[in-house]
């Protein structure tokens, strides 16, 4: 189909797409780039059909400029008068139209997204603002600001992971650490020397001789309690099977609060009934007589109260 002349499109719509009209205007310019206003002016001067309903087709043309890779936006230089950016054709889209005819567009031009957009923009500005480079079809190598590598951010400093871990472990204590689990009364003992060795000593685990000597020198009550014989438990309490150690000590000796673990037996036999409990003062810690008397008074006076109440009930009945 021969290319129609200018006079044959008087009032009818020309058979060109908006991409073809824009490319026609850009290629017809001297610098091969035009602002948006000059593209509108070229189309209206060449095709009288577009002199009406300007707002409708101009919106469509702007949409094609923004969403087609064959057009690139060139910022205006400070020394150039006017406002708005320039629009130009991508240097690699020369074969977009078949045989140079704007009526036949071979394919839609696509730019590979893997290209660095920053470097491409710099190359396009350099290409279109220097006329001696326009004769080349390929882009010149970029000389100037190097593009930073994608796999590395230069503004981040390298940190020593070993130092970070060391600082965190020295200043941070886990909430489930032994110092946080035990009560307040035991914190002084735990921070005063060898807490692990003392607890192993209480639990009966073998402790090296050096650590055992240090424990005995720092906490003499630990060896004292282990050396004292285990108290005898009455036969009626044999079902419970809980070994008890004497904790009595002299009034002049001060013993820090140390947790004493209790090791219950694996299984307990069923207890049908507990016999009458009798208080044996010999297994208790020595205490003043006045305190012992006050403790035994309720146990002695209880049978007398029961017998008097029974007698009063029989009399009134």
Curated annotation (Swiss-Prot):
Pfam families: Forkhead. CDD domains: FH_FOXB2. GO terms for cellular component: nucleus. Keywords: DNA-binding, Nucleus, Transcription, Transcription regulation. It is found in: Nucleus. PROSITE patterns: FORK_HEAD_1, FORK_HEAD_2, FORK_HEAD_3. Its main location: nucleus. One of its GO terms (molecular function) is DNA-binding transcription factor activity, RNA polymerase II-specific. The keyword Nucleus applies. First expressed within the dorsolateral ectoderm, except for the organizer territory. During gastrulation, expressed in 2 ectodermal stripes adjacent to the dorsal midline. With the onset of neurulation, expression shifts first to the neural plate before settling on the bottom of the neural tube, on top of the notochord. Expression is then absent until stage 35, at which stage a pair of cells in the fourth rhombomere in the dorsolateral outer area of the rhombencephalon show expression. Gene3D superfamilies: Winged helix-like DNA-binding domain superfamily/Winged helix DNA-binding domain (1.10.10.10). Transcription factor. This is Forkhead box protein B2. The gene is foxb2.
């Amino acid at each position: 189909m021969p290319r129609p002349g200018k006079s044959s499109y008087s009032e009818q719509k020309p058979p060109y797409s908006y991409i073809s009209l824009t490319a026609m205007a850009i290629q017809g310019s001297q610098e091969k780039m035009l602002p948006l206003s000059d593209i509108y002016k070229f189309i209206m001067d060449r095709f009288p059909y577009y002199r009406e309903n300007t707002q409708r087709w101009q919106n469509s043309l702007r949409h094609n400029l923004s969403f087609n890779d064959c057009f690139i936006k060139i910022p205006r230089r400070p020394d150039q008068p006017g406002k708005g950016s320039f629009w130009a054709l991508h240097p690699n889209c020369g074969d977009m139209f078949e045989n140079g005819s704007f009526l036949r567009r071979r394919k839609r031009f696509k730019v590979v997204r893997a290209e660095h957009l920053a470097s491409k923009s710099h190359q396009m500005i350099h290409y279109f603002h220097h006329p001696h480079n326009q004769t080349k079809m390929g882009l010149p190598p970029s000389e100037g600001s190097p593009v930073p590598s994608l796999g590395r951010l230069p503004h981040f400093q390298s940190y020593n992971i070993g130092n970070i871990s060391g600082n965190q472990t020295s200043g941070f204590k886990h909430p489930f650490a032994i110092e946080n689990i035990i009560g307040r009364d035991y914190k002084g003992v735990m921070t005063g020397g060898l807490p692990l060795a003392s607890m192993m000593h209480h639990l009966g685990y073998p402790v090296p001789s050096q650590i055992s000597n240090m424990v005995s020198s720092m906490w003499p009550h630990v060896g004292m309690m282990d050396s004292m014989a285990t108290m005898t438990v009455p036969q009626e309490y044999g079902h419970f099977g809980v070994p008890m150690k004497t904790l009595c000590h002299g009034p002049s000796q001060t013993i820090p609060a140390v947790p004493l673990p209790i090791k219950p037996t694996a299984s307990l036999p069923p207890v049908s009934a507990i016999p009458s409990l009798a208080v044996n003062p010999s297994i208790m810690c020595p205490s003043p007589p006045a305190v012992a008397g006050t403790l035994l008074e309720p146990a002695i006076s209880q049978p007398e109260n029961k017998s008097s109440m029974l007698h009063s009930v029989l009399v009134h009945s």
